Amino acid sequence: MVVITEHIEARTKQFETVPEAEAQGAIMMTWLTNQLADDTRPRLEKRGITDLDPTGWYNFQTFLDVMSEIVKSKQNVSMTLVAVGKGVVENLPLEDFPSIEAFQAFVENLHGASVRNMPETESHVVIQEDSNIYIVNNTPVSNDLMYGFWWEMLRLYSIGGIKYRPIPHQDYPSNEVGTIFLLQPEKR
């Protein structure tokens, strides 16, 4: 079994980042437009965010605080955060990945392309082990949000012509640090 600590030097705490970390507006727009935006939009509005510029950069901790608030509310937590994650995919210009190497490059650059000024320890990692593909979430982003993101992306796009589904594999609770997702090939 894949053990997260074998692949990551320092585990990132969920919902915490450095003060200078900023998130790209195009990614964060999902908080205002996702399927359950009636729940997420007011949480941003009370923090003074009513509109987002897709080309702008915003304090990343604000969005982590909203995620944390949703988790602490204990109301529709998974459903809300999965909806936000799925909504992110709508804002990205993606296409099928021709190979696992292309997918791995995308995954490993994803967090760094959408968040700047972050600690080097924050990342997503793809591991190929025992004929399986795993994604490690070592970011402060909710595991439920990342599950929604991977679910929607892999629903729409294939890797090397194969469709996959993310399966929570290890350390999954949404209020814990990091997790591992197993990418399971769809049965035809």
Predicted regions and their residues:
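Terminal low-complexity, intrinsically disordered regions
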Residues: M1-K74
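Short terminal or interdomain "cap/linker" segment that borders an active site or interface and mediates
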Residues: V2, V115-N143, Y157-R188
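Generic signature of intrinsically disordered, low-complexity segments enriched in small/polar residues
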Residues: V18, M29-T30, N34, Q61-V66, ...
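Amphipathic interaction/junction segments at domain boundaries or subunit interfaces
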Residues: R47-N143
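Hydrophobic (often cysteine-bearing) scaffold residues that line and stabilize catalytic clefts
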Residues: M146
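Conserved short hydrophobic interaction patches
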Residues: F149-Y157
